[in-house]
Amino acid sequence: MVGFFSQKVREKIMLIRELSLKHGAKAHGKSADASQRPTPAAFELSNQAYRSVRSMVEAELKAGVVNFSYRTDSGCRTLLRLHRSLLWLKLMLEGLSEGADGGRLKTPGELSRDAYRVALAPHHSWMLRQAAEIVFLALPERDYFLKLVCVQTQQEATPILRIIIQALTLVHTQTQRILAEHELLELP
């Protein structure tokens, strides 16, 4: 699941980078070759419209790239998906940082399911929700996730997870504010 989640995030980030290059090329009167993968150096040369979340949102709205009626490949739509995934991760880590509930620690599968139901399930089809249920059953044990944050015990994990959660909360709150300000929270 961690590998799958990481791959989906990488794909969405790459899409935003490609959109940035296309936007930059159009701004300079050139056509962008969609088949070429952008390089880090190319990003430095691209238009400044994608230098921040706010500038990307404003540039895409101004250019008419975002459609509120049907799905389009836009940085705003992709950012919204990343934003929802960030909420899922934050909620899952909050659960992982908590102590025993009624004498027992929840499994990562239970924590992921709880977070999924809040953050992602409302935006997914029935079939995708059912597939997610299967994934939750296959998640590794808590120790695996603790090792991901370089700790061995729950006691060691809690303060580190709280720092990570605080950073995720800051990013989520700022992005939420920008998306809400431009009424982008329910893009198709």
Provide a role label for each language-model segment.
Residues 1-188:
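Long, contiguous alpha-helical bundle segments
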